[in-house]
């Protein structure tokens, strides 16, 4: 391909990625939700899984974009990645690392594990939004993504609770989750310590959102399509 062709391709790629993100965002915005307090609102298990998979994929995309932007703006040359390995607050939850491991887990246990991970992010996502608002010169794109992820995480958690209610009606799962204690680090006066705390939190969010996305796709195949997919 000539140089002109490569130039055209390079100029089109960001536009295609933007269109893809906009379409995914529109898909999330148009997902059917039962009105709060609705008594007779029934959504099929298949529709619930469809919605959950779209939401989880959307959250993972936003998490990856937010982490990548933060990394470029604040973490270059600081060696944060070597310190971030195995330092997530959700590491206390035993989560399968790949598809093969996840396939060995009973679907009931995997559903409950997703609930625990999602609940473990309620508090840190709330404080992430609050602290990013207070960051000097923090770009609006990072703040807007943090706000969107917090909202969609709540929606996904509500959807997962409905899924568990249909798969195992009458069974109430204990609200077990991993406690996050990283707020003081996000508020440290030392810039390097504070920036690493943000970096680590976003790194863990990207990791966990990717796991949830994969687990949900596996569960949808197993439960909705009886593993015929």
Swiss-Prot record:
S-S pairs: 34-41, 88-204, 221-229
Molecular function per GO: hormone activity; prolactin receptor binding
Gene3D superfamilies: 1.20.1250.10
Membrane-spanning intervals of the chain: none
Gene Ontology biological-process annotations: female pregnancy; lactation; negative regulation of endothelial cell proliferation; positive regulation of canonical NF-kappaB signal transduction; positive regulation of cell population proliferation; positive regulation of lactation; positive regulation of miRNA transcription; positive regulation of receptor signaling pathway via JAK-STAT
Keyword Phosphoprotein: yes
Residues with PTM Phosphoserine: 56, 64, 120
Places the protein is found: Secreted
Residues spanning the signal sequence: 1-30
Record bears the keyword Disulfide bond: yes
Any one GO cellular component localisation term in the record: extracellular space
Pfam families: Hormone_1
Keywords carried by this UniProt record: Disulfide bond, Hormone, Lactation, Phosphoprotein, Secreted, Signal
PANTHER family, sorted: PROLACTIN, SOMATOTROPIN,PROLACTIN
Function: Prolactin acts primarily on the mammary gland by promoting lactation.
Family the UniProt entry places it in: Belongs to the somatotropin/prolactin family.
Record text on subunit structure and interactions: Interacts with PRLR.
Protein name: Prolactin
Lineage: Eukaryota, Metazoa, Chordata, Craniata, Vertebrata
Gene: PRL
